[in-house]
């Protein structure tokens, strides 16, 4: 089927381009592709376990290049900070355990929250110290992706994608030509082409407005179908509204989505509350290869 469509597409796409269809041409509802489809990957039949993948950012998709306490101690030495890395680490635990008076921790650029955290963790209220630390974590060099993250996301998004492009072109061509072949195509070929849509991937994170810049610097921003940031939408995990915002943007059903995160309450409890499965990073899945293997299941 795939080989046939690829051969047919060369002439079909040329004619399709010559017709110059308008951008707003819509396909009939019968052409909308269903989920949980089969596709071929290197001669191997694969089934998608989920239609959508939601990823937490900090601690999951984004890993620190160096332990935060070491960075704070190194930068702090220029401002007279004498605390050890171990002491700063303990200070961070106290800071994050303390109640935050506002509805959201991350509002806008998150400066008020982070300023309180830095001051509580280090005992240093120097504005210049805070600004240097804040700007350090606004740069991609302070973070890295887990091994295999980029490749796995590309693999999931490309699942069946090359067929999808050919399939879409042929559909548009037949609709525009009002071809009699369309009925045959619709009745017999479409049911076997349910592999054409791919896994949708979104970031769902409690983060401030630096996140998009970080994802861009790490060359992954364009990989995502949606980026849902708490400081932008006004909800923080575990609030189900932030997960709903992601599902709505992806046009995905909760029962056909899985969320990956590292926090039991924010990620697992929040996702499960809206009917989304959750795999805890470091427990249920430890690598992005694990995620890929659970998302795409080989058919025997």
What are the functions of these language-model segments?
Residues 20, 25-159, 173-177, 183-184, ...:
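N-terminal helical cap/lid subdomain that shapes the substrate entry/recognition surface
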Residues 2-51, 86, 128, 150-159, ...:
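Asp-based, Mg2+/Mn2+-dependent phosphohydrolase catalytic module
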